[in-house]
Amino acid sequence: MRPQMRWKLCWENELELSDHTELAEFFRKTYGPTGTFNARPFEGGHSWAGARPELRVIGYDAHGVAAHMGLLRRFIRVGDADLLVAELGLWGVRPDLEGLGLNHSIRVMYPVLQQLGVPFAFGAVRHALYKLVGRLCRNGLGTIVAGVRVRSTLSDVYLNLPPTRTEDVLVVVFPIGRPMSEWPSGTLIERNGPEL
């Protein structure tokens, strides 16, 4: 039986301290099983890990935060083309609800993406999430773009690390204002900022 979900769409400025605290706990529990390093950014009430989202879709059930997706509009470079996108990140579904939340969160976010007038939305996830993201892309809602790496700046400066990192991740593109055929070709996406 599917749990009753209540969805909240909110701009970052609308979140209260209690919202950030609850979201930080959600992310620690959701990302923690993938490694303690992945949960560390959410210590101290941080509800973001790299770049801070401007808009969030948060799903709640009787037990609190159940699912989350953040959005940040930015220009990226794909090959030689600069492109305005809505980056989707901070994707999460509480472990006991896996298979139920992400599809619903993109469906809640999709009309907002259309209102924002962006040509594309894109996200980057670990290859281990291929099956989950594949379900999200069924029916032509999105496309998994293979063979693309993403270069980002680190969210903090470390004297012992280079200022950028290039990752081999799974890139997912959602055509919003333009058809998928207009997504630029290229094997490298330059975020020109930290990941969301």
UniProtKB/Swiss-Prot annotation:
Assigned keywords, A-Z: Acyltransferase, Cytoplasm, Nodulation, Plasmid, Transferase
Disulphide-bridged cysteine pairs: none
Enzyme Commission number(s) from the entry: 2.3.1.-
Cellular compartment(s): Cytoplasm
One Gene Ontology molecular-function label: acyltransferase activity
Primary localization: cytoplasm
HAMAP family with a match to the protein in the record: NodA
Entry function: N-acyltransferase required for nodulation. Acts in the production of a small, heat-stable compound (Nod) that stimulates mitosis in various plant protoplasts.
Protein name: Nodulation protein A
Source organism of this protein record: Sinorhizobium fredii (strain NBRC 101917 / NGR234)
